[in-house]
């Protein structure tokens, strides 16, 4: 939407969910359902996991589509620094909203549009970050579509080229061990950029 309109704009991400009891998340619920169906846990345990794994507001706690794309948008330069790595329910997220308000005033005053920010190099930075984070493969479709909308050529070949020289260094769920909230604790994505 921002690229199609090409008006000064900034993305404000809602933030990630805090972990549930005993380091649980949405995947814990899926696994518990499977365990219950297999007869490995009683219904009371399944219900307890369902009630405690998702403690409040925010996107899924791992490097799923929402956190992946929020990180990519930050790397593109379309959101505030470190805004993709904030818990939904936090003072940092409130401050991010205030900072975004100040930033949009600057963008409007200087007529800085998405087409000025979303360059080929910006998309390459976003792709590099997503690969480093082990982000969702949905980023491929979304970033190609975003680039096309703004008139920048990004193809699957760009992902392959960048991926061949970029290691995955984050160990984030769903395939890894850690949650986004733990990446936040060590500084978010800024140290990676």
For each of these PLM feature ranges, what is it?
Residues 1, 47-51, 158-193:
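Phosphate/diphosphate-binding loops
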Residues 141-152:
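Alpha-helical support elements that line or immediately flank enzyme active sites
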Residues 135-141, 172-174:
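Short acidic alpha-helix initiation/capping motifs at coil-to-helix transition points
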Residues 8-11, 150-158:
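Phosphate-handling active-site elements
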Residues 13-19, 53, 146-148, 160-169:
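Acidic, glycine-rich active-site loops and adjacent beta-strand->loop/helix elements
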Residues 1-125, 129-130, 135, 143:
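Active-site cavity-forming subdomains of large catalytic enzyme subunits
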Residues 81-83, 153-157, 191:
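Acidic/polar loop patches that form or flank catalytic/metal-binding clefts of enzymes
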């Amino acid at each position: 939407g921002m690229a199609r309109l090409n008006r000064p704009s900034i993305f404000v991400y809602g933030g990630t969910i805090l972990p549930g009891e005993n380091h649980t998340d949405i995947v814990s619920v899926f696994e518990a359902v499977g365990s219950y169906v297999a007869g490995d846990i009683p219904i009371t345990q399944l219900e307890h996991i369902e009630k405690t794994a998702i403690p409040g507001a925010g996107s899924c706690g791992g490097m799923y589509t929402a956190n992946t794309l929020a990180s990519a948008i930050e790397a593109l330069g379309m959101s505030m620094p470190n805004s993709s790595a904030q818990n939904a329910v936090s003072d940092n997220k409130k401050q991010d909203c205030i900072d975004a308000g100040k930033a949009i005033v600057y963008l409007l005053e200087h007529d800085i549009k998405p087409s000025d920010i979303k360059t080929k190099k910006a998309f390459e930075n976003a792709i590099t970050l997503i690969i480093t984070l082990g982000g969702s493969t949905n980023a491929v479709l979304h970033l190609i579509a975003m680039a096309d909308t703004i008139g920048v050529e990004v193809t699957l070949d760009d992902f392959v080229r960048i991926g061949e020289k970029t290691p995955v260094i984050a160990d984030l769920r769903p395939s890894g061990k850690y949650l986004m909230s733990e990446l936040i604790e060590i500084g978010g994505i800024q140290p990676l950029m």
